[in-house]
Amino acid sequence: MTMVQSLWRKRASAALEEFRITLPQYLLIQLARRRGAIRPSEAAEELASDRPTLTLVARKCVARGWLSRLRVKLDRRSHLLRLTGLGEELLDRIEAARVLGPEALGDPLDVLDSEERAQFLRALDKVHRRARDLF
């Protein structure tokens, strides 16, 4: 699966170049859209990123105006990341261009018939649950 992920990330990164956004930046602002305001530590965990890397990505997103930082009232050292209107507009443009869907990037599972696909997805789900238990 790592090889498939690597190939997908490479194609997705190339598709995002015209929008002047990196894949990690896109994933972070997409997460902020889904979750609303989110702590950087939670974002790092959800995106399987280390905190220093996520911090750099977040700073760039804030500098570009796609995210804003909100101070947490009870803990002034802590902050949340929230999608801005500019970030929302960027996501809308990317989605409208349909550059990240299977029709643009391809679907590696299209070589499987429906039964094979169902078996594969069940097996993948089983491996995913086991990995969660282990890690």
Regions found by a protein language model. Give the residues of each.
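Short, locally clustered residues in the helix-turn-helix/winged-helix DNA-binding domain
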Residues: T2-Q5, Q30-R34, E95, D125
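N-terminal helix-turn-helix DNA-binding core of bacterial DNA-binding proteins
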Residues: S6-D50
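Short, conserved catalytic or interaction motifs in soluble domains
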Residues: R34, G85, R132
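Residues within helix-turn-helix
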Residues: P40-S41, P52, R59, H79
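Charged, amphipathic alpha-helical coiled-coil/dimerization segments
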Residues: R59-R122
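Short, charged, intrinsically disordered terminal tails
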Residues: R129-F135
